[in-house]
C-alpha cells in the first residue's frame, strides 16, 4: 500500500513539474486596453455634455437677474452639483446634474418668454 502511494505521489510530482503544466497559466488571453470601453466612452460623452452645459451657466445666471430669486438660487445649486459631479467622474451624479441643469435652463427660458 505504501509503495502504491509513493509511486502515485512521485508520478503526480513529475506531472506537475513538467513544462506543460507549469506554462498553462502564462497562456492567458489579455484584452487590449488601448481602445476605450463602452463605459469609458459613455462617461466621456456625458462629461463633455455636462461641460458644455456648465459653459452656459454664466449666461443663464445673468438672465435670472430680473426673475424670481428661486431661479438664481436653483441655478447656482445645480451648477455646484455639476462641478462636483465632473470632479467625481461618477456616471450617476453626472447624469443627475445634467438633467437638473437642462431642467432649470428650460424653466428660465420659459419664464423669460412669458415675462417678455
Curated annotation (Swiss-Prot):
InterPro entries recorded: HSP70_C_sf, SCIN
Signal peptide region: 1-31
Primary location recorded for the protein, binned into one broad class: secreted
Keywords: Secreted, Signal, Virulence
GO-annotated cellular components: extracellular region
Region (Essential for activity): 62-79
Cell compartments where the protein resides: Secreted
Job of this protein: Involved in countering the first line of host defense mechanisms. Efficiently inhibits opsonization, phagocytosis and killing of S.aureus by human neutrophils. Acts by binding and stabilizing human C3 convertases (C4b2a and C3bBb), leading to their inactivation. The convertases are no longer able to cleave complement C3, therefore preventing further C3b deposition on the bacterial surface and phagocytosis of the bacterium. Also prevents C5a-induced neutrophil responses.
Family: Belongs to the SCIN family.
The protein's name: Staphylococcal complement inhibitor
The organism of origin for this protein: Staphylococcus aureus (strain MRSA252)
Native organism taxonomy: Bacteria, Bacillati, Bacillota, Bacilli, Bacillales
